Amino acid sequence: HAVATANCTTALHLALLAAGVGPGDEVVVSPHSFIASANAILHDGASPVFVDIRADTLNMDEQAVESAVTPCTKAILAIHQIGRPAELTTLAETARRHHLTLIEDAACAIGSEYRGRPIGCNDWSPLVCFSFHPRKVLSTGDGGMITTNDAQLARRLRLLRQHGMSVNDLERHKARTIVTEEYPILGYNYRLTDVQASIGLGQLRRLDALLARRRAIAARYDAALAGAPGVQLFREPPHCRWNQQTYLVRLPGVTAARRDAFMQALLDAGIASRRGVMSIHREACYIERFGRQSFPESEAASDQCVCLPLYTQMTDVEINQVVAAVRQHAPRA
């Protein structure tokens, strides 16, 4: 089952609701993500319990999740950061052992693979949430989707998505008899529009070509930046295949200020970049709720990582310009 939604934030909200997450519950999640991952938990009335990341994957340390589980834990939210799959085998086993629901935040991960299987196949978890934001590999302008292999979950998701309506518009309009809808539960207006869906279907037919081009650009970056002073590259593990939504490099040992100066030098050379992934626990609204917390690996990665340009229309000349600027301006720790 694939349930389309207005965006991935609404997908996460619905997935958590469908899993029974509510007030007083806890959800184990990485602090190293866009803030929506944790916000969706708060919007359900639950509390995020952060677990630090691994420096090599930028994903939640799967071995540390066990110690974060309490009697209040209801779910584990596994984030495939920038399209790089989390260690689902270990996380699924932890979830099974503690009778928790494993939910995948696959906002960035359409087209990525884990142990030979596509993210979204539901082999490890019953709920996988995708984003079709403009930054993603497949975009509908904005949009989201939840995949599930559970028919009851799919029905609940569709009810929640459309005001709790018992009959969807298509079924009602195709019916040869009068159909009066009912509203057995309180729901939301979280639907994807037909126009966005039509764009998504067109993009889906191009997905293999989009992925191939992104992987080719990433391979050129890998070759050209290998051994560049002051630049650390991330290597794809053999059991994963990244979709290369984002090409991320690390400037080891630098402060956020030096990282920002590097980004400014790129911008002055006509090259846009972005900081790496944020650390949610450092944002004011989370400090106000939970106090100051320390997750050193997430904080260091947030301060030292930079996203370089990568888009399917990128030319080899542009790639070479980025490489030259990175080699010229990369700070030495």
Regions found by a protein language model. Name each.
Residues L17-A106, E113:
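PLP-dependent aminotransferase-like
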Residues H1-G22, G45:
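Conserved core of the PLP fold type I
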Residues E104-L138, R155, V179-P184:
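Conserved active-site segment immediately N-terminal to the catalytic lysine
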Residues H1, P23-E26, C72, R155-R156, ...:
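Short acidic capping loops at alpha-helix termini that bridge into adjacent secondary structure
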Residues V3, V28, V49, T101-I103, ...:
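Structural detector of well-ordered beta-strand residues that form the stable sheet scaffold
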Residues T5, V51, L308:
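Hydrophobic residues at beta-strand termini and immediately following loops
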Residues C121, F130-S131, G144-N149, L201:
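Short beta-strand-to-turn element immediately C-terminal to the catalytic PLP-Schiff-base lysine
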Residues Q63, S67, A75-I79, R84, ...:
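PLP-dependent aminotransferase class I/II
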